[in-house]
Amino acid sequence: VRPIDARLTAFAPGRTQRGFSKITLRRLLCACVAVLWCVAFAVGQTAPAPGSPAADARFTEVPGTVIDHSPAASGVYIGSPALAVLPNGEYIASHDFFGPGSEKNRTDLFSSQDKGRTWRRIATVIGQWWSSLFFHRNALYLMGTSRENGFAVIRKSTDGGRTWTEPKDETSGLLFGDGRYHCAPVPVVLHRGRLWRAMEDAMGPDGWGRHFNSFMMSADENADLLRAANWRSSNRLAGNPNWLDGGFGGWLEGNAVVAPDGTVVNMLRVDTPSCPEKVAMVRTSRDGREAGFDPATGFIDFPGGAKKFTIRFDPESRQYWCVASIVAEPYKSKGKPAGIRNTLALTCSPDLQRWVVRRVLLEHPDTLKHGFQYVDWIFDGRDIIAVCRTAYDDGLGGAHNYHDANFLTFHRFEDFR
């Protein structure tokens, strides 16, 4: 599979000017150009704006199509990519912002009407973070938290992501307002008349990783998804630091997946000090009320298991597929698996137990300031389409590090089967 070439689209116009009586003619002309590009953006044009980051020739080496860019110097980094396809064929992508310069409560949304070749920003949502995008019953939904470790919330859009409902109370999208919650853009799965989505709270002891308690949420497919009473939750499971011979550092960012036996399982990222990477398979009862984990059998070797991943089942190949940030052999001595994100690979399994790497999709030899991570993806016929939190060179000093990404990129991986 070859990464597609970057095609860059601008979103932001230039800044307004002050002190017009003192500015030079050149500055006045630049200001006029900026206003014209404001108008172009307002009417939905996608041509690159002069001087905008997306129009910068220095981005042509970035793999894929650049959707958004935030320079490291801003202290605002790009996180939580999510992707959905509307019935009319329009692609919708989203991401949030983290880092010392961010409020850790904002999600931006983008639209592509040409199969991912060009993108434009269509909305900014304040009070939404770590969110999945999914389309259900003629509406688009954002489901995640209100901010970093905030309340669990869901929003609805009936105009393709341009405007969104506000989760003000338990009837309008506030699902849990009683504590600290955590998740990522993970799959929302329809199975046996219910929608399923994994979640964690962050209310356990001992800090990051070990404070996550995993659980499964589900709702009737015909229910009003904005009403908290329509969502059912399993019991919440805490991890145990003694698991994996004392190497268990926590579980998080679980995927709801329909197992071969027809039950829904929660496949969770596991923080470990060394390879092989692992996932934890938590079993869920058919009614979604009970979750259970057996540490003797529930840990599975899984390439990329120490970072966020997305698993989806393909009926045509009868395989489970995953796009994950694996630790390739040359990099296994570079540090903890969670800190190695320079290789993106396609993996698959017939049964959720035996996973193999099918091909490397993206790779860079540097592990310190380059990363391909947190990929959300969808089957698109013979291809996989994906959005990626990408740390890469930008001509401005590059990413702060492999983790603190400066790009959101779109990719099409052809003929994945």
Region spans (language model):
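Bacterial N-terminal signal peptides
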Residues: L29-A40
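Catalytic cores of secreted/periplasmic lytic hydrolases that degrade extracellular macromolecules
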Residues: I311
